[in-house]
Amino acid sequence: MVDKRESYSKEDLIASGRGELFGQDGPPLPSGNMLMMDRIIKMTEDGGSHNKGFIEAEFDIKPDLWFFDCHFVNDPVMPGCLGLDAMWQLVGFYLGWLGGEGKGRALGVGEVKFTGQILPTAKKVTYKIDFKRVINRKLIMGIADGEVYVDGKLIYEAKDLKVGLFKDTSAF
């Protein structure tokens, strides 16, 4: 049974990483340091500019986050790839929220643009995911556009984020 709500706490997201939110067959989120969000504040099945679904999530920035110590020494910045991964994580989470089963895998992105950075002085990152299409056949796949904001300023844009759910990843 899918635990389908419009918002999720950090504890809920951690439970997803253990396979407790969408069941053992649903797609888990990453756990530990690779979970790149602290809460989902809005999820809709029919929202967004394409009326195919929308997610808004947040990540609290603290100066002691693990990546600031190593990326880069004396020039700390959150790696842009972690923001991109967060958007893929949210696309996979949405597929599980819809009842999809399997392990989530990022399948690509059409275009990514970085116009800013996330520094240790920032307070909050906001992710917005706007779904364009969900394919539910042998392969379950979500296609979405995403935006990343730091303290309200748009800094990353991604077009055609693709995530698929796979019951068997041995040949992937």
UniProtKB/Swiss-Prot annotation:
InterPro entries: FabA, FabA_FabZ, HotDog_dom_sf. This is 3-hydroxydecanoyl-[acyl-carrier-protein] dehydratase. The active site is at H71. It comes from the Bacteria. It is found in: Cytoplasm. It holds the Pfam family FabA. It comes from Proteus mirabilis (strain HI4320). NCBIfam families: fabA, PRK05174.1.
